[in-house]
Amino acid sequence: MISLVVARDRNGAIGRDGDIPWHIPEDLKFFQRETVGGAVIMGRRTWESLPDVARPLKNRLNLVVSSGRPEGAEHVLPSVEAALEVARDAGHARISGIGGAGIYRALLPLSHRLLITEVDLAVEDADTWFPSFDEAEWTVTTRFDLRAQGSRCELVEWMRKL
């Protein structure tokens, strides 16, 4: 199953100046629980935005899509299709696209599930957005609050209709 795991603001923003414009521990814990044991596909900038101590993401097959050779990345692939092939050849049934916007755009048509943390704020000067998708092709299967204090966060699971 291919899932996209993302946190976005109320306008769909996911980034500003190469970084995630919020810090929400509850969402980070959810991200870890969801992705551990599987394969994660990310772009070079997402790879480089990870703190050195978190790179590579532990207990996951880290696949970086890039035309270059990002420092410290063991598995660098030229396309999401090549990354999917490596993940499947390694026996991973759970594959998560974790950003950035180009990875989300490329994987969206192939994805079965969207795990979207809706962050109740609007990021000024955002420069990166999650792609829009046709909600008629998807069904909300789960919705729950990750965080009630501070910036409210709601996790919404969408499954592609068959």
Predicted regions and their residues:
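Enzymes that bind and transform nitrogen-containing heteroaromatic metabolites
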Residues: 1-162
